[in-house]
Amino acid sequence: MPRAVHSGIAENIMNTMKHIRYRNWGPLALAMLLTLAGPLYSPPADAHGERAQQASLRMRTLHWIDTEIQPRKVAVNETVRVTGRFMPSQFWPEHMRSIEETAFLNIGVPGPAFVRIDSRVNGVPMIRSTRFHLAKTYEYEVVLKARAPGRYHIHPVISVEGTGPIIGPAFWVEVTGDQKDFKHTITTMTGEVINPETYAMTSILWWNALWFVIGIAWLAWWFRKLPVIMPRYIKVEEMGDDANKLITIPDVIVSVFFFGFVMVVIAGGFFWANYQYPITSVLQTGKVEVEPLPQPPQLVEVEVNKATYRIPGRSFQVEMTVTNRSARPVQVGEFTAANIRFINDKMFDIKPQDAQDLVASSGLRVENPPIQPGETRTITIYADDALWETYRLTSLINEPDGRFAALLMFFDDQGTRYMNEIGGPMIPSFG
């Protein structure tokens, strides 16, 4: 674009700004006031956006099993244990980075309300990242120490590189006491006992203050005189090849001084840190290997024939062929999809433990009798509950890859559990 055109555009902008009447600033001022005041009236967030995650992401990535968080009420300095199992789905979406590449066990909690004391998967410390194999089962444990009083919704989380956090089921934990009483010390490799809450705080404040002053001084030098911002841009366009004259000899001298001073500060900080902390350990970036739990023999085999979701009734229907190779009769007791547990109330009386516990106590309808040992039978189950709509799983019918994945749990008359992952295309029904 010709330089004259640039200059004309800039002049038009400036002329427009000059001719704005004071009465026109009223709506703008009101909008700015509402924007600034909004956070003061925003209600607190109760959870971590589980409903906002894509339905296929929740259904076809991780199956969380037997998640438990205990105790649910602790005081500051007391510990909370998050335990359970998870299984990466064999139907993992192909367009997403796989959990078999890089993953990390984490905890989802609002703010630094807890300190993680220990985390393990199958007994292996999870200080670093790892990888998890599809269709394999892993057992995890995370120990947290309460730091700040409040009521918190705690989730186990697996963070997958390139995919993001995959959130597990959650429970509310209440922390009582006073944060001033919180104590957390660690012993370094040299035997020094430190408090991470305040360690090297003086140095941190001084360094931040120094760089802040340097930045303000640099900006003040260039803003000390006109023109700046838009007027300066117009001036550069007007002067053309002579625009370099806007930068004076004192400007060059001050710039060289700032550059030299910053280099001296960086070098001085480097040598000071080496003197102050002569023994250091490099942050480790390698992965640890975690072997999956031994897989039990597949005594109950399942083949999905057809899966439909009836939109008017919020009913998910799966027709499947089941072969029972165990020694006892089995029956479907639970269907778990996207952290929602649909329970066969004829077998179990399981109630939600709190308002956000995703349990449909009578959401699983199984009309067939138990499947006998050695029998192969085609059965149909119905997972009916408003949670399909409440947690936006119905959006699956609008996705280009309308496939589902879930855990189906059979139980025999002695309470032995047999888990099967099922999945495949889901067909919406509007009738």
Which role fits each region the language model picked out?
Residues 245-276:
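Internal/C-terminal transmembrane anchor helices
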Residues 214-256:
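Juxtamembrane interface at the cytosolic side of transmembrane helices
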